[in-house]
Design a protein with these regions (language model features):
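Class I S-adenosyl-L-methionine-dependent methyltransferase catalytic core
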Residues: 1-212
Length: 212
C-alpha cells in the first residue's frame, strides 16, 4: 500500500464509528521504558481496553513488580469474540484489578486478577468509570480517535497524568495544540504503529504518544 493510500484510509477510519486500533506490545515496550521511574507506587488505569487481550494490560501486569506499581485497573466493553475489541456491542462490561504477584511465580495468574462486572457499558464517560478514574495516578491507553478531544478533556478535568496514543491530526486540534504550546502536554519519544482491529490493515502513517 502506498503512503498516500495509507494516509487516506487512516483519515477515513479516524472519522468512522469503528475506529478501534490495535497497539503492538513492542510499541508499548519501546515507549514505556522511558518512564519507568514515574510509575513507582502508582495506580495505573487503562480505560479503553479489553484487558483479556489488551497489550497494555499484558505489559503492566507482567511488569508490575519491575515498575513498582501499586495497582492496575482496566475497564472494557465485553467482547463477543476474544480476539476482537468492541464498543457497545455486548450485554456486560467488566473491569479487572491486579495488585501484584501473590504466589511468588512473578506471573499474573488468573486467580490473582479480580474480575468485576460494571453496571453500565464500560464507557469511559460513565459515572462508574469516572469513579475508577479518580483512583488512578496515571492513565495509559489507546483511546478511540473519534473521541480523542473529549477523552483528553476528561483527563485534564480530573487532573490526571497520562500516556496515550493519538493520530497525527490530534496534535493539531486547538485544544491539544494549546496545551502543547503551554508545556502542559508533551509528545512521546517513539512513534507507535497501529493496526485497524477489523482487518489488521496497517493505517499507521503517523501516530504519536502524548503524555502529561
Amino acid at each position: 500500500m502506498t503512503e498516500i493510500a495509507k494516509n487516506t484510509n487512516f483519515n477515513k477510519a479516524s472519522k468512522a464509528k469503528n475506529d478501534e486500533f490495535y497497539t503492538q506490545l513492542s510499541d508499548i515496550e519501546r515507549e514505556l521504558k522511558h518512564y519507568k521511574k514515574h510509575f513507582k507506587d502508582k495506580v495505573v488505569y487503562c480505560n479503553c481496553d479489553d484487558p483479556r487481550v489488551s497489550n497494555f494490560f499484558h505489559f503492566f501486569s507482567y511488569n508490575f513488580e519491575k515498575f513498582g506499581l501499586k495497582k492496575l485497573i482496566a475497564t472494557c466493553y465485553k467482547n463477543q469474540s476474544m480476539d476482537l475489541f468492541s464498543q457497545n456491542k455486548s450485554e456486560q462490561a467488566i473491569y479487572l484489578v491486579y495488585e501484584g504477584d501473590k504466589n511468588g511465580n512473578m506471573v499474573p495468574d488468573p486467580a490473582e486478577i479480580g474480575i468485576r462486572e460494571l453496571k453500565g457499558d464500560g464507557d469511559f464517560r460513565s459515572k462508574e468509570c469516572i469513579e475508577l478514574l479518580k483512583q488512578a495516578d496515571i492513565v495509559v491507553t489507546n483511546p478511540p480517535f473519534s473521541l480523542f478531544r473529549e477523552y483528553v478533556a476528561q483527563l485534564l478535568e480530573y487532573d490526571k497524568k497520562f500516556l496515550i496514543i493519538g493520530n497525527g491530526n490530534s496534535i493539531t486540534y486547538k485544544e491539544i495544540f494549546k496545551n502543547i504550546q503551554d508545556n502542559k502536554i508533551w509528545l512521546g519519544v517513539t512513534k507507535p504503529q497501529l493496526f485497524l482491529i477489523d482487518n489488521k490493515e496497517n493505517f499507521a502513517k503517523y501516530c504519536s504518544w502524548i503524555f502529561r
